[in-house]
C-alpha cells in the first residue's frame, strides 16, 4: 500500500494540550520495598529515564551500553553547520509542553527554545511529476490535524543529556555488548562480548526491537513462541538521513513522496533556525531506503540524490553543492538495526510481558499510554517521549 509523507515525521502524533503539565503518578517518586540490584541494557532515552527513576528511589543499578556513547538513536552533530543537527530523532511530534511533562516540570512553556514547525512551501512528487501544494492546503492541514515542534538552537540529544544524565553517566559501562541473558536462576546473569559477567535481581532490556529481531542476544531459557512472534511482527524499518550543504537554497521547505512503505522526504534542515547555512536533508525509510541501498555506498547514494534534485531544479543541486554531506544509516547501524517502530501487528501483552518477573522490556516500541491523563497528549509508539515514558513505566512495574 502506498503512503504519502506530507513532511518528514518520524511518527505522526496528534496533540490536544489544553492545560499545564502537572505531576502525576508516572513521574512521582515511588515508595517501594524492593532493595535489589538492577541492570539496564542500553543507554538510550528509555534506559536513561529508567535509570533516573531508579536513582530517585535509591535503587542500585548499572547500565551496560554496547557502543562508546550514550543516546542510542538520539545523536547530534555540531560541526557540519552553524547550528547543531539531530542525526537521529529530530521532531518533537507534540506540543512543546510535552517537554515539561517528561521531566515533571509544571507549565506549558519549556526552558528550551522551540520552533513551531509549519512549513507551507511544500512540493509533492508522484511518479516523475513534482507539483506545488497550495499554501492554504498546508495551513488547513496544520489547523485540522497536527501540531508539530522542533528544537531551535538545541537538539533532542541536548534535552536528554541535560535532564537524564546527572549522576547517571558514572553508572554506564560503555562498549559492553550483551550477548547472553540467563534468567534461569535466582539471579539474572548477563554475559558481554568481552567475556565479562554481570548479575542482578532484575534486568531492564532497552535495546531497539531491531536488535531483538536480529537475535544477537541469547536468552536462557529461550523466549516463548508467543514472545518471538510478537517481536518479529513489529514493523521496524531500515532507513537513513542524508544531510547536504549547498551555497544557496534552491529547494522548498519540504518535498514529499508517495512510497510503498515507510516514507521519503526532503526537508530544509535549517527551517526556523538561526542559520546562514543551507542544509537539505533526505529522510528515507522503508522501501525507498532499500532501493537506495542497492546503489552501493554513501557516495553512490549522494550522486543519485543530486541527479534527482537536478532533474527537479534545472541542475541547481550539483551547481550549488559544496561537497559536504553526512550519511547517517540507522538501518545498518550495528546497535540499532533500524529506525523506529512504525506498526505493530502482535498483541502488546505478549510484546510487553516480562520474563518470569526478572527480565523487563522498555523503549519506544512498548508504549501503552495512549492519551496521557494530565495534558491530553496522545503518545504513539516510535517517538522519543514514548521511549522516556516507557522507561518510567517499567520501573514502576518492578518497584510495585
Language-model segment annotations:
Residues 39-41, 64, 198-212:
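Short hydrophobic core segments
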Residues 36-63, 395:
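N-terminal Rossmann-like FAD-binding beta1-loop-alpha1 element of flavoenzymes
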Residues 92-120:
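N-terminal FAD cofactor-binding segment of flavoenzymes
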Residues 13-38:
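Bacterial Sec-dependent N-terminal signal peptides
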Residues 145-189, 198-201:
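Helical element adjacent to the flavin cofactor pocket in flavoenzyme catalytic cores
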Residues 46-49, 135-142, 187, 264, ...:
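Conserved flavin/dinucleotide-binding core of flavoenzymes
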Residues 55-80:
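Glycine-rich FAD pyrophosphate-binding loop
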